[in-house]
A protein has these predicted regions:
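Acidic interaction surfaces
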Residues: 2-164
Length: 164
């Protein structure tokens, strides 16, 4: 039994080493951009915000890292610099979202899908991979703003972010 246990533990160690190497090889900014681009194409997105943060103080509780991907309009207004200005005809903005269309709903395809729709489940899985790569690359206290610009190109901007 001891030999089997050691063999199993060695196998686990070997697999963990392989996973670490794969992450080092494939968890890159370029591949993160590819996954974000795939998410935008698959779900016809207009804008998302990716936020990872660790609080400096949590009222005695452990300060644990969290990360989220936001695509609802209310969340984007909170986490995306200037997102709420895209409707203002007098403000210069970079978003493709049309000023002339007050009925425009951001990320409408994804927001209109029922929660149990398989496409939404696939979106959550892809979003989880994006969050994992973002955390691996940027660790914590980051914000990534992604949007389709007026020319129809995907823009990705990362900045430091502190939620305290």
């Amino acid at each position: 039994m001891t030999t089997e246990l050691h063999t199993a533990l060695n196998t686990i160690d070997s697999l963990e080493d392989q996973i670490t190497k794969i992450k080092a090889d494939f968890y890159t900014k370029d591949n993160l951009a590819v996954l974000i681009g795939d998410l935008f194409k698959e779900y016809k997105l207009d804008a998302i915000a990716i936020v990872g943060t660790t609080p400096a103080f949590n009222d005695g509780d452990p300060c644990t890292h969290s990360s989220d991907l936001y695509y609802n309009e209310d969340e984007l207004n909170c986490y995306f610099n200037g997102f709420d200005e895209r409707y203002d005809e007098y403000e210069d903005h970079d978003f493709l979202a049309p000023v002339e269309s007050p009925s425009f709903t951001v990320n409408s395809m994804l927001n209109d899908l029922p929660y149990q729709d398989p496409k939404k489940a696939k979106c959550h899985k892809l979003s989880a991979h994006i969050l994992e790569l973002s955390d691996y690359i940027y660790d914590t206290n980051y914000k990534i703003e992604c949007y389709i610009d007026k020319e129809g190109d995907l823009q990705i901007h990362k900045e430091e972010y502190y939620d305290y």
